[in-house]
Amino acid sequence: QGSLRDDFNFGSVVLLKTTALQEAAQRITADYQAAGFYDLRLKLSEAQSLVHVNEYLYSEVELDTRKTGERLFDYVDPKNRQSQVEMEQACTEHLKAVGAYLAPGAYKPMRVDEGAFPVEASIMIPVRNRIRTIKDALTSALNQKTSFAYNVFVVENGPECHSTDGTTELVEEMARADERIVHIVTDRRDLGVGGSWNLAAHDPRCGRFAAQLDSDDVYADENTLQKIVDAFHEQQCAMLIGAYTLTDIHLNVLPPGVIAHKEWTPANGRNNALRINGLGAPRSFYTPVLREINLPNTNYGEDYALGLAISRDYMIGRLYDPIYNCRRWDDNSDGDLSIEKENCNNVYKDRMRTWELMARIAKNRKNQA
């Protein structure tokens, strides 16, 4: 029900019931160049059950042999823009048909300048075993020039409760030299990236806004945090997503370069969010909303799940100029996944989409009652 991404891999062998195909085809109104099969299978799913036979029934030669980290950005590559527009149109029509479409503008009101916080912003860095990159990330965070006070949370996670490669000691050393660093090491062995965010967000030292910085990435320049906070006050939103530049570890630009996620529009972004595989970076949050909803305690898709839940009721703001460098290197967690791990990740996000789809249908029914 929630497998709405247009790159869902059904495999090369698909059997269709003729009468169901004919019925679905009669409801097709658009002549797509790229979204034809996607539109068809969405319409099939509106009236029929799609069944996966979990047995080996055939073999084929894989033609796309790129690593998962290379395929990850296909949907935001500018050369694929027109096909993505078609996919969005097909998905939006499907959401309207099943009662999950959310009309633009129906948001809960926000006043992000209300209330008192110890600092205006907190930079969030979950970390585990990033001795090669954590100093770059922390230096980037500490070098921000702002008109307000901010701090930097570094939250360790993983089965050992802390890093085992020297990261913990390096962060401790940097924290002794700069009191803005809030280094959290717990005795929890179940803590994932999402749980690390929750721990920092509920800490009384957390600021009005919480801004993402992954432990192997860096901000584009010293003005990133100021731009984020200014945008929150200008747009009065619960979540803010920026644009980023794809680079290697040495900050050399990699194709497709700037990822601006222009598929997000104020009118239809939260509907299209159910189709795409990610919302963008860096992600920042108004802390009271983050504390209200929280992230799932996982190491994958936790930010996507939170973004979907926020977008159901609150406005998500955007910055389309690159303010963040997403570094691709040999130790990216999603750089070269096995087929089994990639499938596991996709199933998790599809489950998030299913739950969100059901929540939106329920919301619309309640509003119509």
Indicate where each model-derived feature is located:
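Acidic donor-binding loop at a coil-to-helix junction in glycosyltransferase catalytic cores
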Residues: 31-40, 299-306
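A conserved acidic beta->alpha catalytic loop
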Residues: 156-170
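Glycine-rich, basic loop-to-helix element that forms the pyrophosphate-binding segment
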Residues: 187-205
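Conserved donor NDP-sugar-binding/catalytic core segment of glycosyltransferases
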Residues: 1, 223-256
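Short beta-strand-to-loop acidic/aromatic patch adjacent to the donor-nucleotide binding site
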Residues: 207-218
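Catalytic beta-strand/loop signature of glycosyltransferases that borders the donor
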Residues: 51-57, 63, 243, 317-323, ...
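A recurrent flexible, glycine/aromatic-enriched loop bordering the glycosyltransferase active site
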Residues: 2-15, 262-284
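Short, acidic, metal-binding catalytic loop of nucleotide-sugar glycosyltransferases
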Residues: 139-149
